[in-house]
Structure formats: structure tokens, C-alpha cells
Amino acid sequence: MAVELGVLLVRPRPGTGLGRVMRTLLLVLWLATRGSALYFHIGETEKKCFIEEIPDETMVIGNYRTQLYDKQREEYQPATPGLGMFVEVKDPEDKVILARQYGSEGRFTFTSHTPGEHQICLHSNSTKFSLFAGGMLRVHLDIQVGEHANDYAEIAAKDKLSELQLRVRQLVEQVEQIQKEQNYQRWREERFRQTSESTNQRVLWWSILQTLILVAIGVWQMRHLKSFFEAKKLV
């Protein structure tokens, strides 16, 4: 089963109050759905990778559990404790920020330090166990980004917060996450602008180079034809 996650970005006209309001509303709606729950199948030596766009200084929590296909029952059963998953996370600069072996069910966490596309890869350690024996493994994965990664029930119990205090804390963290998302969108716009300017500059220089090459070829052809006609005494 192939699963593709995407985000639709609507860009209002800049410089208008309505555009700023719409952008804020879109960010709020997007933040409300930043949890990504899915499942996928992997083979014995297969690796699955996912791309998640994450702002900087944002916590990400991934929960997973594995199921092994039982050929006799023809259904997926909970995997044995000996079957583990290796999780590797790379930042947009391709630096490894997490690489660790986990069990058949577990949780991994990391905090982004660079905004952009983070690569999350999982594969099993099944080559060490004959119980897998070329079968298929089903992995249920749930990724929570930003304030959605917080367990507010646990926070309230730990810090002894009232319902009002907890709600205020949730709102504060939501506002902070919105600010991070806005900063990330501005960073993306700046990168896009730089890429566009660089591309336009290259196109301009390539056009100038093509023009110079054509002029040089034209001059060379005229001189060559003149020499040819003079050699044939036609001029």
C-alpha cells in the first residue's frame, strides 16, 4: 500500500489584510491536522522512507507497531518481541539526527533544528531472524508534529494544572506553533525567490551566450565565404 501525504498551500495576494487573515486561518486548519496515521508493508530487507516538512525547533513524535503475516491463518498477527525496527531520521542537509534500533513496538522522538523536508526511514532487523523468512511485515505508523506531539493529560498531572491553566497553555503553544509555521513559510518563499532570481539570471546569461555564439558563427561564415569567392576569383 502506497501512501502519499501532501499539503495544499493557498497563497493570497501579498500586502492585503485579507491575505494575512486567510493565511493565519489556513495555518490554524493545517495545524489541526498535523497528525499523520497510516500503515504500510515492507519486505525482509526493504526500507520505507517518508518526507515530512517541519519548521525549526519543532518536536516530532512517532509511534509505531508491527504485525507479521501468518501464512497458516492468512492474516497479520502481532510481531514477536525479537523482531525490531531501525529508525533513521535525516534533516534537509542530509545529516543524521536520529539512528536507533527499537523493538517490534515503540516510540521515537526528535527535535528539528533546520526547517525543511526531513526524511524518516524505517526497516526491520529481520535478516537476523528466521521467523520472518521472507514474509511481509505490516507497520502502523502515527507521526505527531509540534504541539500535537504533547500529551496534555500527562502535562496537567505532572504540573498540577487546572483545566483553565491547561487550556491557556495549549493556546500559547498553538500560537507559538503558528509563528513557527509562518516563519517556515516565509523561509520557503525566500528560498523560492532566490531560486527564481538565480534561474532568471542563468537564462539571461545563456541567452547572451547564445547570441554571441550566433554572431561569431555568422562572422566566421562571412569570412569563409569571402575567402572562398576570392580563391575562385568570383569577386
Curated annotation (Swiss-Prot):
Keywords: Acetylation, Coiled coil, Endoplasmic reticulum, Glycoprotein, Golgi apparatus, Membrane, Protein transport, Signal, Transmembrane, Transmembrane helix, Transport
Annotated GO CC locations: COPII-coated ER to Golgi transport vesicle; endoplasmic reticulum; endoplasmic reticulum membrane; endoplasmic reticulum-Golgi intermediate compartment; endoplasmic reticulum-Golgi intermediate compartment membrane; extracellular exosome; Golgi apparatus; Golgi membrane
Predominant place of localization: endoplasmic reticulum
Glycosylation sites (chain numbering): 125
PROSITE patterns, per the entry: GOLD
InterPro entries: Emp24-like (IPR015720), GOLD_dom (IPR009038)
Signal peptide: 1-37
Lumenal side: 38-202
Stretch list, region Required for interaction with STX17: 121-160
Protein family according to the UniProt entry: Belongs to the EMP24/GP25L family.
Name of the protein this chain belongs to: Transmembrane emp24 domain-containing protein 9
Annotated source species: Homo sapiens
